Amino acid sequence: METGNVVNAQPELSGIIDGSKSYMYEQLWKLCAGPLCDIPKLGENVYYFPQGNIELVDASTREELNELQPICDLPSKLQCRVIAIHLKVENNSDETYAEITLMPDTTQVVIPTQSENQFRPLVNSFTKVLTASDTSAYGGFFVPKKHAIECLPPLPLPAQELLAKDLHGNQWRFRHSYRGTPQRHSLTTGWNEFTTSKKLVKGDVIVFVRGETGELRVGIRRARHQQGNIPSSIVSIDCMRHGVIASAKHALDNQCIFIVVYKPSIRSSQFIVSYDKFLDAMNNKFIVGSRFTMRFEGDDFSERRYFGTIIGVNDFSPHWKCSEWRSLEVQWDEFASFSRPNKVSPWEIEHLMSALNVPRSSLLKNKRLREVNEFGQEIGQLSVASPMNTSLRYRDTTEDAMNPSRLLMSYPVQPMPKLNYNNQMVTQIEENITTKAVTNFRLFGVSLAIPLVIKDPIEEIGSDISKLTEGKKFGQSQTLRSPIEIQSKQFGSTRTCTKVQMQGVTIGRAVDLSVLNGYDQLILELEKLFDLKGQLQTRNQWKIAFTDSDGYEMLVGDDPWPEFCKMVKKILIYSKEEVKNLKSSKSLSS
């Protein structure tokens, strides 16, 4: 991973008061902290969540987060004002952290803030993940040409000496040259001393920052497997947890300041949230079935977004009632090489348009009485299901899997209008018309005087329609089949699986009803397919519905099991809120 930027120095950290630190220090600290670092502004109103602070303590000591019962009556969140922010770095590990000073309920306290329009000098920077060659004892550090030109001082051939300062204030000297075959920019003399002192290994990240005056800064980011190597403390983890709570409680009761330590390198849910960000998250009204996306940084420092679905809204711990921190239980769409939480906070995710926002008129059709003169319309629908018109009526699940956004529209569609050419086609089939060609010429020695019977191109379709017509005479109910189903039947296979779609989940599942003995087994099987773990049995958050051959939706469980197996065409899992909406719009039968 290599990145280069020309940015206004740390606009996100404007307002930090730390007289001993310059804007170059702030910019280097931010790059070493990573792109997901979120620091509040000086004087800003924030919400502080003690639960998140305890999680950070546990993660720092590599202890599992357990449900700590508060030793005092402390709210799940405190409204505070940011008094001061100090950006620091560990002496031994170069791990960045911030000391944030907070004061609860400071509505009458005047706190000086730095103007947002204050001039911030431009800086150039680049980062690079170190390779085995970069960290070898006899090698050097190769700088990409683009970054060398933009971020390093102009090189007077054949070489120059660079002086760079790290976050501790230590100065490092590197020899910068442009040599080799092919010629490349490299740092040689002094580089080995730097990597040895910092104990850099393959996979770590090097950061260079250059200001307008030519000042050069250097920093590092540890690979994920090296982070969190904190020595054992004589203070027990329980004492540290209770210390977090006691400190916040004392500050709340006595209207005094308290200091919170934030470590960007540790994957934990944000527990100091700006007031505006919190309100924006709450206004989204996340409910079960909502779709979202969330930013992550992988072990290789690559940043990407992962998509998921909210499957539950509840407290993370019974000891912290009505807490928004990690209150959303989620299910991820795809696999990741690193662990992701199954419970997140509303302000960490970005809300997406869910299946709830798709107009129901385009998803479902209402059940109505079938008129006697609608036979031509049924034929028209069958003709759409024919191989010549596959794209109009049928979409294979493989196509849906490749384009998840289309899966939301995979419900039964509105009936096709009556088409004149379908009536003409039926007339031709019933009259069994054949085309005869008579000629007195010979072609390649073969007499063409004999009448040739040319098969009608819709003969095979006509045979299927004739069978359906005969079935209708005996009152049999026929359903449309996809080309894949027709093909599988031609080879002697019978499809017994029923498609299952869960609200908010892009990829559907399939269940074989022929191996199940009743609704109880069906519910257990659906819970396994979507990893719901008993949530369908309680019916507190999810409801199960199904569609019949006419696209009419009904709740599961009202019909005898054999009748249900005959009627069902698709099984749908809705949130309880969506079921209420469907019933109110009369799209779902009670």
Swiss-Prot record:
It comes from the Eukaryota. Keywords: Auxin signaling pathway, DNA-binding, Nucleus, Transcription, Transcription regulation. GO terms for cellular component: nucleus. InterPro entries: ARF_dom, ARF_plant, AUX/IAA_dom, B3_DNA-bd, DNA-bd_pseudobarrel_sf, PB1-like. It is found in: Nucleus. GO terms for biological process: auxin-activated signaling pathway; regulation of DNA-templated transcription. Gene3D superfamilies: 2.30.30.1040, DNA-binding pseudobarrel domain, Phosphatidylinositol 3-kinase Catalytic Subunit, Chain A, domain 1. Its main location: nucleus. Homodimers and heterodimers. Belongs to the ARF family. Auxin response factors (ARFs) are transcriptional factors that bind specifically to the DNA sequence 5'-TGTCTC-3' found in the auxin-responsive promoter elements (AuxREs). Could act as transcriptional activator or repressor. Formation of heterodimers with Aux/IAA proteins may alter their ability to modulate early auxin response genes expression. This is Auxin response factor 20. It comes from Arabidopsis thaliana (Mouse-ear cress). The gene is ARF20.
